[in-house]
């Protein structure tokens, strides 16, 4: 992140896009806690450092050393942090579409996060999702009610450039899976089906090469 601040106009446009995401039963179960206070950010950063160390203990060298070398947060450097939350009580206990699959509420919040991310990119704003954190620390520091769930902690700011590939793909931590390896037809792990021949062939050619 650079030191350039995000204008209020741009931040409002980004939040507007996030708030217009689709949601189960039109429940709009999200809230956006905006954070720029350095004292709060320092405490969140400390939580990251603790959880980061714990995570590193789950792997052995040389992977451990590689993991510890990655830049996985920009809490202090980014001018704006946003905690996106899920409130299951909005509009009462009955929400159309959530009775059979309660998790649809959190999935709706993820739609808002995706909208926020895309809108930020459109405005030339970089975004990092920090998930190496304690939700208990977030709830305490942000004074979230007991029933409200922190879903994402986002760092936003201007960046010097946008990479063409995700960082972890670029450094070889994990590969980008081919589309053909994640699409099944009609049944789990069924890789061929006569009813899907055309799309099957298109997918096998690799979408990145299609014009």
Residue ranges and their predicted role:
Residues 1-4:
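Generic N-terminal amphipathic, Lys/Arg-enriched alpha-helix
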Residues 14, 18, 82, 95-141:
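Small-aliphatic-rich amphipathic alpha-helix that forms the alpha element of a beta-alpha
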Residues 19-25:
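Glycine-rich phosphate/pyrophosphate-binding beta-alpha loops
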Residues 28-109:
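Glycine/small-residue-rich phosphate/adenosyl-binding loop
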Residues 52-60, 144-168:
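A glycine-rich helix N-cap at a beta->alpha junction
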Residues 86, 132, 158:
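Short secondary-structure boundary segments
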Residues 153-211:
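C-terminal helix-cap and adjacent tail motif
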């Amino acid at each position: 992140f650079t030191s350039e601040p995000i204008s209020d106009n741009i931040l409002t446009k980004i939040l507007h896009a996030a708030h217009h995401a689709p949601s189960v039963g039109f429940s709009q179960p999200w809230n956006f806690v905006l954070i720029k206070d350095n004292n709060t950010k320092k405490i969140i950063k400390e939580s990251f450092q603790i959880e980061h160390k714990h995570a590193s203990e789950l792997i052995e060298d040389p992977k451990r050393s590689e993991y510890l070398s990655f830049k996985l947060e920009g809490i202090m450097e980014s001018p704006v942090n946003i905690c996106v939350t899920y409130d299951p009580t909005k509009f009462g206990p009955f929400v159309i579409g959530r009775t059979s699959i309660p998790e649809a509420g959190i999935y709706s919040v993820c739609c808002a996060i995706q909208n926020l991310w895309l809108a930020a990119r459109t405005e030339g704003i970089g975004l990092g999702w920090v998930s190496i954190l304690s939700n208990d620390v977030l709830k305490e520091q942000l004074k979230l009610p007991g029933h409200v769930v922190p879903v994402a902690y986002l760092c936003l700011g201007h960046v010097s450039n946008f990479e063409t590939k995700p960082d972890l793909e670029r450094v070889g931590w994990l590969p980008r899976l081919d589309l053909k390896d994640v699409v099944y037809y009609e049944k789990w792990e069924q890789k061929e089906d006569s009813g899907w021949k055309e799309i099957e062939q298109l997918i096998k050619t690799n979408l990145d090469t299609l014009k």
